[in-house]
Amino acid sequence: LSGNEEASLLKFFNYKEFVDSESLLVDVGGGSTELYLCDKNEEKLKSFNLGAVRILKGLDKEKNWQELSNFLANINSEQIQNIIGIGGNARQIIQAAGVLKDSLNLEELQEIRSRLGKLSLEEKISDYNFPSDRADIIEHATNIFEYILLCFENAKFFASNWNISDGYIFKKNAEISQATSLEVS
């Protein structure tokens, strides 16, 4: 799937618990970051060539960060109350915060990033039970979420159990349902 196709799958995310507040959905993957905002007036979605593995390998470029910054600047900062992280990186960040946390403010996210930055790969695995394929990139994923949260300082960061693959399944089910209803009529 292309990055924009991945971003479009975020619209299938069911976020009933956040229905009364504006939310920005963010999926930080290894090679890209997808954002989706749907408010009463418009839908915005975009994929950026910024991912945790790209940063780890030094492949992130200033122009990619600038594209993300420009996209975020076109969203009313007072409007967003929730940054909902999609996927494993977001869940691992919340896990690092502790058992009783379900959301983080900017200061808490920055503290976690700082703490993770001081740990070796082995310590991240043993202390936080991070999978080995996630332990080396989690700090970089946290950097991306922090960058976004800096634009929406009043927002809280949440992690969802949902993944992009769930969006793909919901999309396919919707297509099948639509095709079936057309056959019946």
What are these regions (language model features)?
Residues L1-E22, Y36-S185:
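Helical "lid/coupling" subdomains associated with nucleotide-phosphate turnover
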Residues V28-S32:
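Active-site-adjacent helix-turn-beta-strand microarchitecture at beta-sheet edges
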